[in-house]
Swiss-Prot record:
Pfam families: TruD. It comes from Xanthomonas campestris pv. campestris (strain B100). Keywords: Isomerase, tRNA processing. One of its GO terms (biological process) is tRNA pseudouridine synthesis. CDD domains: PseudoU_synth_EcTruD. This is tRNA pseudouridine synthase D. PANTHER family: TRNA PSEUDOURIDINE SYNTHASE D (PTHR47811:SF1). The gene is truD.
Length: 367
């Protein structure tokens, strides 16, 4: 198991090379809220459009503006600074007296909407994200690219965790191993080492990276076998747009119809303590895919950390996927994804896209 493995493509070989995020406007993300504001309460709900600023920076800025601790700021998800993004923040103001909103507006940040709500905005409280991505310096046959996009819209894609989850050069996986009490030798084998003690936020980041690496390992096996979007004996099914899981149960025409209309998806493990939800062939593939020494070390560490077995859909279908050629070498994509899903997974099925923000000296990984 590699810290930054090359993932297989489900739709065949790459059909393009391109660059993304040459400028921040080439990567636009708008949150799709999960609820309407109540219009009352002591949390000021702000919709903020920002350029070149990540979520943590804006949260700190809002806390300073309101004169409150940062724990009084809520947001549903993290957004990268190398982008133009719109997202909600809640600001706890018990007296319902807000400072001058215009003081927040500048060239790189604007409050586009504000209202009151009766509770703090919680992580994950969003319906999804809408993306508008502009790829530049595109090299590839337009007919083949158009066909690949139509195939993605019709069949979906593997629901990979994006490379952002793993840090630069996959370093978060190595850091997770160190946290669990392992060090990698020069020959690639693992040896016991003193466990690293970390802050809670760092620990959470590394636990997520370890889980994500194991999930991607299972998904790799399913893609290589060609059954990432097809039923196996013993499959555990995940409802679309939900964390609900059911099965295993005998294959039937009802399940076939639900799978065909993307109401359910095959699932893979988010590792933790407890029994695998799947069985038979599906469980055999998962155990085989995670039987190497590094995977076993990550599994043991996650179980010891108190995480429980959960599931994640193996398949993802971008919603409202559309594209337009702005010129012969510039392709614009628009689509929406559920929370926790990665736009880079869509781009990977197209080809090799260089992230200009990552190769620039000032770049940092997405948040």
């Amino acid at each position: 198991m590699s810290d930054s493995p090359v993932l297989p493509r489900a739709h065949g070989a790459a059909v393009l090379t391109a660059a993304m995020r040459s400028v921040a406007e080439d990567f636009q993300v708008d949150e799709l809220p999960a609820f309407d504001a109540s219009g009352e309460g002591e949390h000021l709900l702000l919709s903020v459009r920002k350029r070149g600023q990540n979520t943590a920076y804006v949260a700190k800025r809002l806390a300073q503006w309101a004169g409150i601790a940062e724990m009084g700021i809520g947001y549903a998800g993290l957004k990268d600074r190398h982008a133009v993004t719109t997202q909600r923040f809640s600001v706890h103001l018990p007296k319902r007296i807000a400072p001058d909103l215009s003081a927040l507006d500048d060239d790189d940040m604007q409050v586009v909407e504000h209202t009151w709500h009766n509770r703090k905005l919680q992580r994950g409280a969003l319906h999804g994200n809408r993306f508008v991505l502009t790829l530049r310096e595109v090299v590839g046959d337009q007919t083949a690219i158009d066909a690949r996009l139509h195939a993605i819209a019709a069949r979906g894609i593997p629901n990979w965790f994006g490379e952002q989850r793993f840090g630069r050069d996959g370093g978060n996986v190595a850091a997770a191993l160190a946290m669990f009490g392992y060090t990698r030798q020069l020959d690639g084998t693992l040896a016991p080492a003193p466990k690293r003690r970390l802050r809670n936020d760092q620990r959470s980041l590394l636990l997520s990276a370890a889980r994500s690496a194991l999930f991607n390992q299972v998904l790799t096996a399913r893609v290589e076998q060609g059954d990432w979007d097809a039923p196996l004996d013993g499959e555990a099914w995940m409802l679309d747009g939900s964390r609900s899981v059911f099965g295993p149960e005998p294959w039937s025409e009802v399940l076939a119809e639900r799978l065909a209309r993307f109401d359910i998806h095959p699932s893979g493990p988010l590792w933790g303590a407890g029994e695998l939800r799947c069985s038979a062939d599906a469980a055999a593939i998962e155990q085989a895919a995670l039987s190497d020494p590094q995977s076993l070390a990550l599994r043991t560490g996650l179980e010891a950390a108190g995480l429980k077995q959960e599931r994640r859909a193996l398949r993802l279908r971008p919603q409202a996927l559309a594209h337009a050629w702005l010129d012969a070498q510039t392709l614009q994509l628009t689509f929406a994804l559920p929370p926790g899903c990665y736009a880079t997974a869509v781009l990977w099925e197209l080809g090799d896209v260089v992230d200009a923000a990552r190769v620039a000296p000032q770049s940092r990984s997405e948040g």
